[in-house]
Amino acid sequence: MTRVARFRSWDGTELAYRVTGDGPPLVCVPGGPGQAVAYLGDLGGLSATRTLVLLDNRGTGDSAIPADPATYRVDRIADDVEALRAHLGLDTMDLLGHSASGGTCMLYAAAHPARLRRLVLVAPSLRVLGLQSDVDLAHVLAERSHEPWIDEAAAALTAEAADEQDLERLRMLAAPLLYGTWNDAARAQAAAEPAQFARAATDGFYADFTPDPALPERLAALAVPTLLVAGEHDVWPTRHAMRQLAALLTASRLTVQPGAGHFPWVDDPRAFAASVEAFLAAAPA
């Protein structure tokens, strides 16, 4: 059973979150950027062992639109995460971020390391660090040269959209690249995406954001145990790009999920949930 709850964040904006599952809490922040949290589902069945607290970022899903559009920015979303932790009454928490919210969670970790027990970054954007996410992209694409859709999808991945309608067309053409297998589950997830995005939240996420040159050093000193999950076939970030992050985060462990893309819990739910649960349940080193 899933319930929706609400709280007032640091600036008074009412934010919504979903609670589902059983077990210790795992706070989950969605990516997009600007995408409602519904796309995370139950993270491949992770709700069987964890109580998932799934945040709808401001202006998305069931959360309210903020009065100030500048608060859509990635570092302000990190402030929302801290407000949610305080609202939940958690002294420390386990935190999971996917895609764009990987950046949110890295900023949060740098600002509030004492509030984290464990951190899970799934296919995180590296933009807040000023690092490339498309390292060896040509090699990743070449590995999928046998797919019937590869030429059209690869062209759409880097094409410039003429307007909003064209953007959606290109998004759907490129969608197979985001999954390990372009099957019914992948198609259903991709088809649901357009309705889940809030344009203002997407546009505002990186607006006027400049990476802090001190952030890599602060994260390198982070002692919080961190799991990095990369999809073997992901194009953004590639598994090669994720090795940069693993080298930076000295307390991290990188796992590359075989046959997975940008949404590893869709490609192989059992493998994803088992990997994350094993990490969260492990005894402290």
Put a short name on every predicted segment.
Residues 6-70, 84:
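Conserved HGGG/HGGXW glycine-rich cap/lid loop of the alpha/beta-hydrolase fold
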Residues 57-100, 274:
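Active-site loop/oxyanion-hole signature of alpha/beta-hydrolase fold enzymes
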Residues 91-135:
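Conserved hydrolase catalytic core segment
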Residues 119-158:
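Flexible "cap/lid" loop of the alpha/beta hydrolase fold
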Residues 155-204, 208:
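Conserved alpha/beta-hydrolase catalytic His-Asp/Glu region
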Residues 222, 228-230:
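Short beta-strand/loop motif that positions the catalytic acidic residue
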Residues 235-241:
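Conserved alpha/beta-hydrolase "acid-adjacent" motif
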Residues 252-285:
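Catalytic active-site module of serine/aspartate enzymes centered on a nucleophile-bearing elbow/loop
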